[in-house]
A protein has these predicted regions:
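Structural motif
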Residues: 5, 97-101, 129-130, 170-171
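Catalytic-core regions built around general acid/base machinery
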Residues: 91, 114-126
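Glycine/threonine-rich flexible loop motifs
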Residues: 105-114, 182
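N-terminal beta1-alpha1 cap of cysteine-dependent amidohydrolase-like domains
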Residues: 1-97, 248
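C-terminal and late-domain segments of enzyme folds
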Residues: 1-40, 144, 148-248
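Catalytic nucleophile loop
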Residues: 101, 122-141
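Charged helix-capping and loop-helix junction motifs
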Residues: 60-63, 112-117, 186-188
Length: 248
């Protein structure tokens, strides 16, 4: 299996609250990388990051189908798996591409466990693409940082949960967009994420940055990214640079 774990895939803009399809992001060669791994006339399944939000899922499915076509990625089937049709997960062996959508990390994590996706991917040899929450849930141990009001101050909120085990890297997406974010009266980065990084490295990706995982488990990070470890932020790469190879 190959995997492309992105902060964002792009593929849409919002106009008056409506999703308008566009080509996928081309920053740091993201679209070229997807094309190089893409099988012509693929069968594709998106697994929702908001499994009970059906209107949103229908909108994402419709938009991404057109976006992939605009991006020169051909397919014969394009499915959205959410709470309405969990049974289609049995078709994973037929799929050439599985996409893990963005959404709420803990909600998607529960859904992935219901689907037994980790077990289903053990002997699957297709292309896995993920963005945002989907990328975060690919970790062996997922950093599910607080994101909704109340989560940062909830003593029962679990910030570390088991994931799909595709990588040991903990991804923090949309970094540049969240630098000024305030949650429950605290700075999301400095007060919350830095504290959670004690003893745990978190890799922060800007939109347009991504990690490519090859069949031999080597991981290459493309684009601007940062290491957050023990409360310290270290820049580890720049746009248009392939800068880090890890063997996990």
């Amino acid at each position: 299996m190959k995997a492309i774990l992105a902060s964002s895939l792009g593929g849409q803009i919002k106009v008056d609250g409506k999703r308008i399809p566009t080509k996928l992001m081309e920053n740091n060669g993201l679209l070229d990388t997807i094309r190089s791994c893409w099988k012509a006339d693929s069968k594709v399944m998106i697994i929702s990051g908001s499994p009970s939000f059906y209107d949103k899922n229908d909108s994402v499915e419709s938009c991404m189908k057109e976006s992939f076509s605009l991006s020169g990625l051909s397919f014969t089937e394009f499915l959205m798996c959410d709470e309405r049709n969990k049974e289609i997960i049995a078709r994973i062996p037929e799929m050439d591409v599985v996409i893990l959508a963005g959404g709420h990390v803990p909600s998607q994590n529960v859904f992935l466990k219901e689907l037994q996706l980790k077990e289903r991917l053990q002997h699957w040899n297709g292309l896995l693409i993920a963005w945002s929450a989907g990328s975060m849930n690919c970790a062996e141990t997922v950093y599910a940082g607080p994101e909704l009001p109340g989560e940062a101050v909830d003593p029962d909120y679990r910030r570390w949960i088991s994931g799909l085990g595709i990588t040991r890297t903990n991804i923090f997406p949309h970094f540049e967009d969240l630098k000024e974010e305030i949650l429950d009266g605290m700075r999301l980065i400095e007060d919350i994420t830095y504290a959670d990084s004690i003893g745990h490295e978190i890799i922060a990706l800007n939109n347009g940055s991504y990690i490519l995982i090859n069949e031999d488990s080597t991981e290459t990070i493309y684009g601007e990214a940062y290491s957050i470890l023990d409360g310290k932020l270290t820049r580890i790469g720049s746009d248009n640079v392939q800068f880090l190879d890890l063997i996990i």
